[in-house]
Swiss-Prot record:
GO cellular component terms, semicolon-separated: large ribosomal subunit
HAMAP family in alphabetical order: Ribosomal_bL32 (MF_00340)
Full protein name: Large ribosomal subunit protein bL32
Gene name for this UniProt entry: rpmF
Region (Disordered): 1-22
Length: 61
């Protein structure tokens, strides 16, 4: 197993970790009810997907 020869400094370790971040989710606007929703997914508010209601239990907007 590999063992480090030198102790890595705090700044070096933190520089390496700058790329490990969580990206914010991409949101789009539902064309039916104008609510924010994830792309390629049914709207959680009205249940519309590609101009059709795919959730019969959703309230009509």
């Amino acid at each position: 197993m590999a063992v480090p020869k030198q102790k890595s400094s705090k700044s070096r370790g933190r520089k390496r970790r700058t790329h490990q971040k969580v990206a914010a989710p991409t949101l789009t606007v539902c064309p039916e009810c104008q609510e924010a929703k994830l792309p390629h997914a049914a709207c959680p508010a009205c249940g519309a997907y590609r101009n059709r209601n795919v959730r019969p239990d959703a309230v009509e907007a």
